[in-house]
Amino acid sequence: MTTHTHHGSCHCGAVKFTVETPVTPAVRCNCSLCRRKGALMSPFFPAGALNIVSGEDSLTLYQFNTQVAKHYFCKQCGIYPFHQTRKDPNLWRVNIGCLDDVDPYALESSVADGKSLSVVEDA
């Protein structure tokens, strides 16, 4: 896995960030939230690899189920740019579709079985 510094943003540009991460192997998760948001996610990366350049005050937090994972969304446009994982709160993933220099449709992906991690009924 080759790590690059990527620039990214939400759709409206209120949230801008840089992240040092490889983009492959890309992953889709089958949990109830990820199924609905449909994002293609980067491999895990450490929290220190993410830098919010602007718009931290434009982010809103959504948590469900065990309340461990932290899913961030732009308050203005609703786009999900990144999340802190449930598996390890020191690890994050970024929505590859938010990266300026990457075509998410050109990447192959695997499926992460987030559905089996659920401890409550599917929403």
Task: Write out the residue ranges for each language-model feature.
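A short Gly-Trp-Pro
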Residues: 1-9, 14-123
